[in-house]
Design a protein with these regions (language model features):
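Glycine-rich phosphate-binding loops of nucleotide-dependent enzymes
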Residues: 1-125
Length: 125
């Protein structure tokens, strides 16, 4: 509900609300494809949940295809039906969110290899 903010300038709105306003502005053009760059960037947990709701609603209710770049894998898994994981310009995996998130190449790129973890443990001991 944005009624309380209707007379404020966009710049004076809280960051999370500004992101929703930006999303609404983009939807005014009635696009068939919506490109989102890090839609959860700078948002707190509650605002990220709201963003997930809006993205799902855009897809389901308006039938708009959403293509986004996002590092928050939790958000990705909730709103995406297809995921492409990349690292330094190289495609690591493509498919359903769970398939991609559990792909060994993706896990290694985000968390490091088992050898890296073992080496860090030895150094810490």
């Amino acid at each position: 509900d944005l009624q309380h903010a209707r007379d404020l300038m966009v710049a004076g709105l809280p960051y999370g609300v500004r992101k929703v306003v930006e999303l609404a502005r983009a939807l005014c053009a009635e696009p068939q494809l919506l490109l989102l760059d890090e839609p959860s960037s700078g948002l707190n947990v509650e605002e990220t949940e709201d963003m997930a709701f809006w993205i799902q609603d855009i897809v389901q209710e308006l039938g708009i295809t959403v293509l986004m770049v996002e590092h928050d894998m939790s958000l990705v898994s909730r709103v995406s039906d297809r995921v492409l994981a990349m690292n330094q310009g190289e495609v690591l995996a493509m498919g359903a969110p769970r398939e991609v998130q559990t792909n060994p190449a993706v896990v290694e790129a985000y968390l490091g290899s088992i050898d890296d973890v073992a080496s860090l443990r030895r150094e810490a001991a």
